[in-house]
Amino acid sequence: MALLKANKDLISAGLKEFSVLLNQQVFNDPLVSEEDMVTVVEDWMNFYINYYRQQVTGEPQERDKALQELRQELNTLANPFLAKYRDFLKSHELPSHPPPSS
């Protein structure tokens, strides 16, 4: 079943907005754990899903398919963001072993 044009347009708009949200994030102190950042991103995704749930059109199957596609696409955008955050955390880790004294 193909998505309705109106739903495709909503998904496209949602992805653009979500991408802007992710690109606006500045990583700085205080740092949050990777797990907490995953929770934050999942909360953002749920917010977008709930917002667009009220706007998608069509039969229940068409609406469900549109929301499923939106969730998959949001995940696709979130994964590189979370990888970037993971790398940021690694670059700010304190050494686990003190440097050898001379």
Swiss-Prot record:
What triggers its expression?
A: By GATA1 during erythroid maturation.
So which domain of life are we looking at? Eukaryota
Matching entries from Gene3D superfamilies are given as: AHSP
> According to its UniProt record, where is this protein mainly located?
cytoplasm
UniProt subcellular location: Cytoplasm
Q: Pfam families in the record, alphabetically?
A: AHSP
Instruction: Enumerate the SUPFAM superfamilies for this protein.
Output: Alpha-hemoglobin stabilizing protein AHSP
Q: Which GO terms describe its cellular component?
A: cytoplasm; hemoglobin complex
Q: Name one GO molecular function term.
A: hemoglobin binding
Q: Which UniProt keywords apply?
A: Chaperone, Cytoplasm
**Tissue distribution:** Expressed in blood and bone marrow.
The processes (GO biological process) annotated in the record are:
erythrocyte differentiation; hemoglobin metabolic process; hemopoiesis; protein folding; protein stabilization
Which InterPro entries does this entry report, sorted A to Z? A_Hb_stabilising_prot, AHSP_sf
- Biological function: Acts as a chaperone to prevent the harmful aggregation of alpha-hemoglobin during normal erythroid cell development. Specifically protects free alpha-hemoglobin from precipitation. It is predicted to modulate pathological states of alpha-hemoglobin excess such as beta-thalassemia.
Q: Which family does it belong to?
A: Belongs to the AHSP family.
Assembly mode = Monomer. Forms a heterodimer with free alpha-hemoglobin. Does not bind beta-hemoglobin nor alpha(2)beta(2) hemoglobin A.
Name of the protein: Alpha-hemoglobin-stabilizing protein
Q: Give the source species.
A: Homo sapiens
Corresponding gene? AHSP
